[in-house]
């Protein structure tokens, strides 16, 4: 903040107050409907945690112990609580081997303990069933690029919605675009996540991530587009889209996108039409493939956001039929489909995390980020996330089999929990920092 002191005739620069961080302190599990298990993520009494920085918690253990199920159950727990708190509807939990039945967390400088009672069909907050206060729910980002991804996705391709269409949940995994595992779909959804960034300083972190990976802070998007006949004006553009919807849009997803676009106000539609005209001009100049160059710097961020948003809408409506994204390394142009899957996956993960971290109380769930990554790259995952989320108060809960992630954690900002199954059931063990 900048203020002027009229007495001393000087300009005073005041630091912005630090945002209160979100921290998940405890997860209570019900295992096989009989055993209660606590996962302790709280700070140790003799250690110092800076809540204004991102916190890391790792869940480690052998295959089949239930690490991924725990992450999924955290999402379902907060979805259930949201429905109960806002709509007074209690949802009976589908019987699973592992269920989250309680969480303790820090948000907005306060401590909250939320638990559910299946017998009473109630939620309790700080041991009270009178929910007459403004209880913050974390903004959850879920990311997984494995073939057996278990995270739920929103229904974003029709007028109907599912229970995960809530403002506090974002899925940024490989199935984000169309519920299938597709490299090209993941790539274009990454552009959508870029569009969701509102603050310039947050967008410029994308530039920093590219540099950290060894790439230049620029990209080129090439695309082929569908030429609409006899479209010379905005009115003609709208009429052509209506005709597309009535005659040619047999795919329900595309039809929904067309309906959604046509329902927007005139100003928004004119912006997209302007981008379409730019594409037509390149085609009129004899170019079969159109391209856009994006430089991530302070002066061009806003115009790039507008261009990308409009291109994304044109792609959704089927007017852009093919896209390719190119990155640059040492002056050489590299097709993004040719970069390593590990690089692409982690870049998409961090971009998704950034989009949610602009909001308060961000909880980022990442399932086995080491998948498809060489051991040398695994050693950089934590550094990669630290770089992208530097100065952002959030909590990352990560499941992993990689000892490289454990060894690279920042002291006093991280916890490691070992999960194991014995003849007595599930065992949760907090690993000491000095181990």
Regions found by a protein language model. Name each.
Residues 2-5, 13-16, 52, 73-138:
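Conserved P-loop NTP-binding catalytic core
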Residues 111-173:
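Glycine-rich phosphate-binding loops of NTPases
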Residues 141-144, 220-224, 281, 365, ...:
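A structural signal for short, well-ordered beta-strand segments and their strand-loop junctions
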Residues 29-40, 104-115, 179:
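Short, surface-exposed beta-strand/loop "edge" segments at domain boundaries and coil↔beta transitions
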Residues 146-147, 175-176, 400-402:
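Short beta-alpha junction loops
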Residues 2-34, 44-47, 174, 178-344, ...:
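Extended helical coiled-coil dimerization/tether regions that scaffold
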Residues 77-78, 146-150, 178:
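Short acidic, S/G/P-rich loop/turn micro-motifs used as interaction or catalytic elements
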Residues 2-87, 307, 317-435:
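Switch/communication elements of ASCE P-loop NTPase nucleotide-binding domains
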């Amino acid at each position: 903040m900048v203020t002027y002191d009229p007495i001393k005739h000087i300009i005073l620069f005041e630091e912005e107050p630090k945002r209160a961080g979100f921290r998940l302190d405890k997860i209570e599990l019900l295992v096989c409907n009989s055993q209660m298990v606590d996962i302790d993520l709280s700070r140790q009494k003799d250690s110092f945690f800076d809540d204004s920085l991102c916190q890391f918690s790792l869940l480690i253990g052998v295959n089949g112990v239930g690490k991924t199920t725990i992450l999924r159950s955290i999402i379902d727990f907060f979805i259930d609580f949201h429905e109960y708190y806002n709509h007074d509807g209690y949802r009976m939990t589908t019987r699973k081997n592992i269920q989250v039945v309680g969480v303790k967390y820090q948000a907005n400088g306060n401590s909250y303990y939320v638990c559910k009672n299946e017998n009473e069909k109630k939620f309790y907050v700080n041991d009270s069933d009178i929910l007459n206060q403004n209880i913050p729910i974390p903004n959850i980002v879920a990311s997984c690029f494995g073939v057996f991804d278990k995270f739920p996705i929103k229904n974003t391709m029709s007028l109907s919605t599912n229970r995960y269409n809530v403002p506090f949940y974002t899925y940024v995994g490989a199935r984000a675009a169309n519920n299938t595992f597709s490299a090209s779909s993941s790539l274009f959804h990454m552009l959508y996540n870029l569009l969701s960034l509102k603050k310039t300083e947050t967008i410029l972190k994308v530039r920093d991530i590219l540099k950290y990976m060894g790439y230049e802070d620029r990209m080129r998007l090439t695309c082929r587009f569908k030429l609409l006949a006899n479209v010379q004006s905005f009115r003609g553009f709208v009429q052509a889209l209506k005709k597309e919807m009535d005659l040619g849009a047999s795919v329900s997803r595309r039809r929904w996108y067309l309906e959604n676009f046509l329902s927007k106000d005139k100003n928004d539609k004119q912006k997209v039409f302007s981008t379409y005209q730019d594409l037509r001009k390149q085609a009129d100049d004899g170019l079969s493939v159109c391209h856009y160059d994006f430089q991530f710097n302070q002066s061009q961020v806003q115009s790039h956001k507008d261009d990308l948003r409009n291109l994304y809408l044109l792609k959704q409506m089927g007017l852009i039929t093919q896209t390719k994204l190119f990155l640059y390394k040492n002056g050489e142009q590299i097709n993004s489909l040719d970069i390593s899957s590990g690089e692409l996956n982690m870049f998409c993960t961090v971009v998704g995390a950034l989009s949610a971290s602009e909001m308060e109380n961000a909880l980022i769930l990442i399932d086995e980020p080491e998948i498809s990554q060489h051991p040398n790259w695994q050693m950089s995952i934590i550094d990669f996330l630290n770089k992208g989320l530097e100065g952002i108060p959030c909590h990352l809960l990560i499941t992993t089999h990689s000892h490289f992630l454990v060894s690279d954690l920042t002291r006093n900002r991280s916890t490691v929990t070992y999960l194991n199954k014995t003849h007595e059931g599930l065992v949760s063990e907090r690993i000491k920092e000095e181990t």
